[in-house]
Amino acid sequence: MRRHLLPVVSLLVLLLLVRQLYPYVSGSDPSIVDGYEVNLVSENLGGPTCLVWANDTHLLVCDRDGGRITELNIETDARRTLLDGLHHPHGLLLHEGKAIVSEQGQLSSYLIAEDGLFVEGQTLVSGIPAGNHQTNSVNIMPNGTLIWHSGSTCNVCDEADERNAALLWVNATTGEHGVLASGVRNSFDGVWVEDHGYFFTDNGRDWEGDHPPEELNFLIAGAAYGWPDDEPETPVPEGSEAPVGRWTPHTSMNGVDLRPVHSSLPGLSPSEGFTLYTAVYGSWNTLLPKGHEILRIDVFSGEEPNDYTTDITRFVWDAGTPVPLTFHPDGSLYYAVFGGGGKLFTVDAADTGE
């Protein structure tokens, strides 16, 4: 009997192995909605976790695996290291001649030298605990205050440090900081939308079947967003803010950016609302692969302040393990795949040859 079961067990083990490896070896031939195309721009970028434009031709890339910030010329594929020796960099912001760098547990400010290198580093914040997750993207509000995304140390727990599972505000000069929003399990990125406010992604707990969905949230200063009390029976705990958008559980919604009105990619007109695009890494926590896609999120304003609804659709799929994305000044979309050595893709309207 055992001899007959061995081939079946071996097949199941093989299928599970293929399932785990699939996202890391896929993504080179993504699918996209009709009328648009995806093209490979560059390879061997390490473990890309952020994309920031220095200008129209040079893209700065956080390489988590290499512990560095790389400058990539998207026209020639020439590249150079602007800063190395970092511990898992996940975020970068260019602001007033300085580079604000987010790495695991630490936020630092560097002067940008005439040759573009990052020099004379100053630690703004340090000592943020890391565990299951770490500190992620850093962005900025119109008043100059930084927004720093800080992940939880665990799947579900009560954090010992209130700076975990939170969005933090940080003074870009002094490093003074505090909690801007709590109950945010693992928010990777966010984007400021003029005349509206800050929208951010968040990824819920694992190992609970179809609960909870990944989220798009609207930031209200001082608000709580539910974790770790968001049980299946109370998905939006009393006193917490509900998400404005929900997506497939355990798929990891990460980088997010605002579609410019001049972009050729589909989206709402200003009179209708606005459109965000986000990268969905994909799940290791499901039997079958889910995620591995780029989403279009149409956002509509309600009649009440801070009241938003969304319509979310897949735009690119079979995309491997995308993490960061950003719109180019010309309106085309760029995203990077974390697995497979790190690849950069661009998305634009298909060339009809006319």
How would you describe each model-predicted region?
Residues 22-32, 135, 152-156, 165, ...:
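Beta-propeller domain segments
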Residues 60-75:
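Beta-propeller domains
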Residues 38-43, 78-83, 122-128, 176-180, ...:
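A short beta-strand motif characteristic of beta-propeller blades
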Residues 105-141, 151-152:
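Asp-box/WD-like beta-propeller blade repeats and closely related beta-sheet repeat scaffolds
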Residues 54, 62, 102-104, 149-151, ...:
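Residue-level marker for isolated small/hydroxyl-bearing positions within beta-strands
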Residues 44-57, 84-104, 128-146, 182-197, ...:
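Beta-rich, blade/repeat-based domains predominating
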Residues 66-67, 105-108, 340-342:
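Loop/turn residues immediately N-terminal
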Residues 6-20:
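Hydrophobic membrane-insertion alpha-helices, especially the h-region
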